[in-house]
Amino acid sequence: MAKNRKTPNMNLPVWFDGQNINEALFCEEFLHERRIIFANGAFFTPDGRVTDDLPLRGEIYDKLKFCAVNNIPRKITNILEVLKLEAQVSDFPPEQDRIHVANGTLLLNGTFTEGRPAIVRSRLPVGYNPDAPAPVIWLNFLDGLLYAEDIPTLQEFIGYCLIPSNKGQRMMVIKGNGGEGKSQIGAVLSTIFGTNMKDGSIGKISENRFARADLEHILLCVDDDMRMEALRQTNYVKSIVTAQGKMDLERKGKQSYQGWMFARLLAFSNGDLQALYDRSDGFYRRQLVLTTKEKQVDRADDPDLAEKMKAEAEGIFLWAFEGLQRLVANNFKFTESDRIRENREAVKRDNNNIFDFMESEGYIRRKADASISSKDFYEIYRMWCEENSLAPLKARSFSDAMIANAGRFNLEHCNNITNSAGRRVWGFMGVEAVARPHINGFYDVSSCTYVPEDWRD
């Protein structure tokens, strides 16, 4: 259709007869002039997803304002609804092998194509400049914030967030005591990711079933100050970290739908990300936990540091892209230092004291041909907690945790254990009791401190 097509006998667009606007014809002409599609509940252009429709409304208004029609704002809204139908495509899957930047498209193999002719899901506001200088201020900042062996992991994770993929199956938590400047990372990343990054709350994601829909089309979600409370449920967080393709999303007052989810989670915190009930290894295995260096007492903070690092955005992008290429070459397995592994293990132990209990002495003994009932096992565990001033898990949580980690301790959960009364009950093969807290008849009294009545004065 020709641009600004006119009617044969009037100097007017074909979609306006002098009194009324034909929305369908207007949208047909608009799409002929403008590269835009509507898919997965959003408009997309060569600039990426339309996050604010006000500029789009402004374009429509510029074409309508000469028309003497009533209630133009409502007419614009109607046109937008028709435009969704006219520009509709069935699906718009993410492209995991390329990064669309301000001045072109960069493939994972390093090939760069200048220009932006195609409609894309996301386009980063940073440009690709292979000759950009090294981000000296950024690198010096990281050197003072993190241990040297942990910086490659951060480099790979930021690079991982440049593409719409969850193949890495990891989220990142950067933990410190406060005042180290770790949140400056989020400020710098906002310059690189633009509207493809969102400030959010992992706590909200875990407890609000509508929060996941807010992360649709987003590359990175940053929790700048993660709450210290343990998560009551972890399934929403785990599903985001491991999403491969579409997942079920829900918005208030609307029917749930299948949407693309590839948001990566990055949190800054003064503590660990813990679960209130989830003792599974999977929850902790998905965390990359980085600890910051202690802040030097004589360090002078630069209030303009974030702005100085933002000026190095092109160099930081090259640095992150190098990390992405290394991650892809390693089949999306992150570089992990011994410290990161120890951090993850420490978080797991802090939230689940069965590991320390199983390594204790004087309470149980691991033995291949031995067995113990679940009830006796839990009573010994309770005694161990009492004598070490620790809060015990509930009986069901203890059993679930032991079952989940049975392979680690060479145990077998079965229902053919014979208890002291001669009845067959549930229990574990591969462990025997050393302490026997129930012999004195007092559940919470340690057998180590019990004194028989006939010994007392």
Locate the predicted segments by residue.
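Modules that initiate DNA replication and primer synthesis
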Residues: 1-3, 39-67
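Feature primarily recognizes SF3-like P-loop helicase cores of small DNA viruses
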Residues: 2-39, 65-457
